[in-house]
Swiss-Prot record:
InterPro entries listed in its UniProt record: SfsA, SfsA_C, SfsA_N
Sample GO molecular function, one term: DNA binding
Organism, scientific name: Clostridium botulinum (strain Langeland / NCTC 10281 / Type F)
Family affiliation: Belongs to the SfsA family.
The protein, known as: Sugar fermentation stimulation protein homolog
CDD domains xref list: SfsA-like_bacterial (cd22359)
């Protein structure tokens, strides 16, 4: 998917809270919005180069969103709104192998008391619920989720097990917001409960998928499947 708004580079200064950061643009310090509640501490390092997206909205306190950052030569997308958009584009273009037969794609659908990112249907009426998680944490080719404790994430995994137990298809797709990685694994040290829930989901037949992305400063798209170790 293309990012159609104005994109520019800046130097990262600091992040005083989850939603705000300070950057330097042409020697001027400016506050920007961070569209990611994760820690991203391996990416948002003082002095590093980050990518901003200009938001032309007079009602905003900040002019820019901080949407990506360079970790060495590697560009990592950190915009938490991006994964669902990338996966939707991939689903519409039948790029996810095991989901190619699902032709009716609906976003943000509920099942019981649960809300999932996607509800997919085949022409024969078979239903599949898909949850998407964005991944930004990487170390020497190993990617992990989450980078902060996530009760909500664990709840989603357990709800997918319930979907599967009721006879429908269920899966979670970890969208790795960078390219050229070797493996994905749950971050047991950060959130043991999430890791255990994911292991149980796999045992119960929930599909566990991971894909990396082709990331450029003004575009991002689904790339290749990544091996998973749970």
């Amino acid at each position: 998917m293309k990012i159609t708004k104005n994109i520019l580079k800046a130097e990262f200064i600091k992040r005083p809270n989850r939603f705000q950061a300070y950057v330097k643009i042409n020697e001027k310090i400016e506050m920007v919005h961070v569209p990611n509640t994760g820690r991203c501490k391996e990416i948002l390092i003082p002095g590093s180069t980050v990518i901003l997206r200009e938001e032309n909205n007079e009602n905003r306190k900040t002019r820019y969103d901080l949407i990506a950052g360079y970790k060495g030569d590697m560009l990592i997308s950190i915009d938490s709104q991006i994964p669902n958009k990338v996966v939707y584009e991939a689903l519409m273009n039948f790029k996810i192998e095991i989901l190619k037969e699902y032709t009716n794609i609906k976003r943000e659908k509920t099942f019981g008391k649960s809300r999932f990112d996607f509800k997919l249907e085949k022409e024969n009426g078979e239903v599949y619920y898909l949850e998407v998680k964005g991944v930004t944490l990487e170390n020497d080719g190993l990617t992990m989720f989450p980078d902060a404790p996530t009760e909500r994430g664990t709840k989603h995994i357990l709800e997918l097990i319930d979907v599967k137990n009721k006879g429908m298809g269920a899966g979670v797709l970890f969208l790795i917001q960078l390219n050229g990685v070797k493996k994905f694994t749950p971050n047991h040290k950060m959130d043991k409960n999430f890791g255990e829930a994911l292991k149980l989901a796999k045992e119960k037949g929930v599909d566990i998928l991971a894909y990396d992305c082709l990331v450029e400063e003004s575009s991002i798209s689904l790339n290749n499947p990544v091996s998973i170790e749970i």
